[in-house]
Amino acid sequence: MSRHATALETVRVIVPDEAVYAYEAAFQTVCGNVGLWLDEDTGLWHIEGVRERGTPGLDQALALARLASGTDAEIIRTETPAEGWLARTYESFPEQLVGRRFAVRGTHLNGPDTPGRITLRLDAGVAFGSGEHGSTRGCLLALEQLVAKASSKRRVIDLGTGSGILAMAAARLIKPHPVRVMAADIEPWSVRTAQQNAVLNRVSRQLDCLVSDGWKRRPIRARAPYDLIFANILARPLCGMAYPLAQSLEPGGHVILAGLLATQMRMVLAAYRRQGLVLWKAIPQGHWMTLILHKRPVASLEKAVSAA
């Protein structure tokens, strides 16, 4: 069978707020084109993606989404005409400019890099949804603002790294070079993708990619405390890891939390305030919210205790 005769299918789920990020992340790993929209009448989200029919990984990705979200969504499949689909898809995802410093582009785009920006190149199948997704954009904007604040970060970790885009952005932007970044994900295929993208972006020597469920792996704990932590996952897992994350954060350090909807901000923020972290900035991106939290330096803590 020729490449142009590949059979394609569109897969779709309809889920509530709390399951959106888990299912969208699952689709991103196995589909070339992922989109989502909110049905204002029902309050439910429609998530769909296009993939080669019969390729592996979908069932495993959906099982993980069900486990993470607690929502068992029905999968809806329809045939998709293959002719011209790839070209149409590429046209739908041009270079994404994020903030003042970043440009995200798929490997299907040619031409010189955008002047004055750090270009992050991702394989086309992975790039879809990365630069344009509200959570990813929010994290990149947060990183840009922290660096503009002249915060030097030496020990960085990206939890739930996915494509590795945030780890690569930190490796490219943070001074002094070269900063080492730990990039961890619960899924082996995400870690492999991050490794491949690190090579593509010439930062493989700065990224340490490994499979880990949160803070469980010894190499992650051994490198703590971190002065910058990315956690772009889900609202409830973010709440669940508030204690170990706060314990692994250097006094004076920052954490960038994402993967939560604006409606979940209060719940997540409360969990981290109980661990002594304070809100530095909230960055809304559509329905999504990114939080920058700060751990007070030791001197500030001692001053607060003595004044009490």
Identify what each model region corresponds to:
Residues 191-192, 238, 265:
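Short alpha-helix immediately C-terminal to the canonical SAM-binding loop
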Residues 126, 130-218, 225:
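Conserved SAM/SAH cofactor-binding pocket of Class I
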Residues 260-308:
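Active-site capping/gating segments
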Residues 65-66, 198, 272:
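Conserved hydrophobic residues forming the short capping helix/wall of the S-adenosyl-L-methionine
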Residues 239-254:
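A short glycine-rich, Lys/Arg-flanked "PGG" loop and its adjoining helix->strand segment in the class I
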Residues 5-114:
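N-terminal auxiliary segments of SAM/dcSAM-dependent transferases
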Residues 84-150:
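SAM-dependent Rossmann-like transferase core, predominantly class I methyltransferases
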Residues 229-230:
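Hydrophobic beta-strand segment of the Class I
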